[in-house]
Structure formats: C-alpha cells, structure tokens
C-alpha cells in the first residue's frame, strides 16, 4: 500500500508545523474548551485535507516557498474538518475515533458541541483575516454543506428507498465539499484562471467521493481494531451506504431487515453477511475507482512538478486503502 508519508514528502515541513500552529490558533480562554480542542489535534490522523491544500498551493505557485496565506488556509481547512468530526461524534454517539476516545466520551455532549462550535468560530475568524472574499465564500459553503449532509443522513436513516444519487449527494456534503472547495480556494489564492480553479474543485470533489466510498467499504471489510470504530457501525445506525445499496438490489431480504431496524435477534449479523455475500462491495470498489479516475484527469491543467505528482498519486492511494 502507498504510504501517506511518501505522498506528502513535498509538503512535509509545512505539515510538521501544522499541529503546533493549530494548538496556538485555537488556544481558548476557558481551559476545558482548550483541553477539548487540543485533545482533537493530539489524536492525529493523516492530515490529508491540509496536505491537499498545500500540494495544490505548490503546484499552482511553482515557487520554492508558500505564502503565509496558503499555509493559513491549510490550517483553517484542518480546523473545519476537526470541528465537523466533533459534531459527527456527538450525533453518532461515538465513543472512539481512530481508536482514541472522542471528546464527547471524555467530557460530555455539551462540551463536545461547544468545542465544535468554538473550532468553527475560530476557523471563520482566521478565514476572514485572509481578506479574500471568494475564499471566504468557498469555505463558508463547506460549513453549510456539513450541516445539510448531517440532516440528510439523519432523515434518511433506515430508508430503503434511498437512491444512489442521494447517497452521493450526502457524501459530497459531508466529505467531498471540504476537499473540493479548499483545493479551489488554494488555487484562488495563487490567482489561477477560473478554468483551472474549476478543475481543482472537480479534482477535490471526485477524490472526496472516492475517499468516502472507500471508507464505506472499509466499514464492512475491516476489523474494529483497525477501523477505530465498531465494524458495520454505519448500517447498524441506519446509515445506508453504497455497499448496502447495491446489496439490496441483489438480496431483497436485506430491505426487510433494515426496515424493521434490526429489531430481532440475529438481524445485524444476517444483514452484514448479506452485504458481504453480494456484489455490493465489488460494485462499490468500481464506483470509487471511477471517481478516482475522474479526479486524476482534472490535473491535466497543472504543469509537471513534485506536488502535481503527489496529487495524482493520491488518486491511487485512496483505492490502495482497500488492499
């Protein structure tokens, strides 16, 4: 499997600064809010979203050093992403993320919601200080999309009439919007043409969709220890994703289990087995590969560089997580 460390080599110095800068940017007057926010950044993660911002910045600037505004955009992007995770964990009543206790399990839901709100507020403040109205609009749209995606997921729980298009819309709002709009924002700060900015947006959109589809596959195929959350947790909570949508076409009884919300003994195990015994996972892999390929084609607008090579390799990295 391709390692994220090698992929992000062109922006390694900037990523090393990221965590320290984030802790400084979110320092709060109240110690509990500060402790909750710091715990989030200590939990780690691959920092894929800020890395994409930094790589796009290098690929469009073609200079040896980034501007402070590009670096700050990467930090804002990670701040927004982290805030969304905090709220997700509250809504999902999750106790673990990446095998680390969530803020809501360490503190409580009230503190977790406030910590997420605080991060969104801080990101908005630093976003405004970039003094670029188009970038402000792009990242503000992301925050709106997060809320819309969460609402869609909530109202569509256990809905066996959910379409693939509706699933992809929700996946865009919850995952791809941030990657798409932050990639475009990096291009805007580099003063690229509107055509190139749109290509960067579509790169992020399709990469983000591929990333989410792969995550949804891993929810069925990966152990709890590796996944950092209970296997099959999406389906159990009524969140119907691509593997289950495809499996429902092939295994009609899965619809029955979902509609009765796994209320009988053995329903969950049977549902997970029906998904695994269908072509749902294979078809989802094909769907992820389709979007990853579309993402790669959007990079034709960029001149050759180490940063462009890493952005292109990311489309393979996303799929390599399946193997």
Feature names for model-found ranges:
Residues 1-323:
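All-alpha prenyltransferase/terpene-synthase fold signal
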């Amino acid at each position: 499997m391709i390692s994220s460390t090698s992929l992000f080599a062109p922006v390694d110095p900037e990523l090393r600064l990221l965590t320290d800068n984030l802790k400084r940017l979110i320092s709060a007057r109240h110690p509990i809010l500060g402790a909750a926010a710091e715990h989030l950044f200590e939990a780690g993660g691959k920092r894929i979203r800020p890395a994409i911002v930094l790589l796009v910045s290098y690929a469009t600037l073609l200079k040896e050093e980034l501007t402070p505004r590009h670096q700050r955009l990467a930090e804002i992007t990670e701040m927004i992403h982290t805030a969304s995770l905090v709220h997700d964990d509250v809504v999902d009543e999750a106790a673990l993320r990446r095998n680390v206790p969530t803020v809501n399990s360490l503190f409580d839901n009230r503190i977790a919601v406030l910590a997420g709100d605080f991060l969104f507020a801080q990101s908005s403040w630093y976003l405004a200080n970039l003094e670029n109205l188009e970038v402000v609009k792009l990242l503000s749209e992301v925050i709106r999309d997060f809320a819309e995606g969460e609402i869609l997921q909530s109202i569509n729980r256990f809905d066996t009439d959910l379409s693939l298009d509706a699933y992809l819309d929700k996946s865009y709002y919850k995952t791809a919007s941030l990657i798409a709009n932050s990639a475009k924002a990096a291009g805007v700060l580099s003063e690229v043409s509107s055509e190139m900015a749109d290509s960067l947006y579509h790169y992020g959109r399709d990469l983000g969709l591929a990333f989410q589809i792969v995550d949804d596959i891993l929810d069925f195929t990966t152990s709890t220890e590796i996944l950092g959350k209970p296997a099959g947790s999406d389906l159990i909570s009524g969140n119907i994703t691509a593997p289950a949508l495809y499996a429902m076409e092939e295994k009609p009884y899965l619809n029955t289990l979902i509609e009765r919300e796994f209320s009988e003994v053995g329903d969950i195990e049977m549902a997970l087995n029906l998904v695994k015994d269908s072509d749902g996972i294979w078809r989802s892999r094909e769907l992820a590969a389709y979007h990853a390929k579309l993402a790669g084609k959007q990079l034709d607008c960029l001149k050759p560089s180490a940063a462009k090579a890493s952005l292109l390799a990311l489309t393979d990295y996303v799929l390599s997580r399946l193997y």
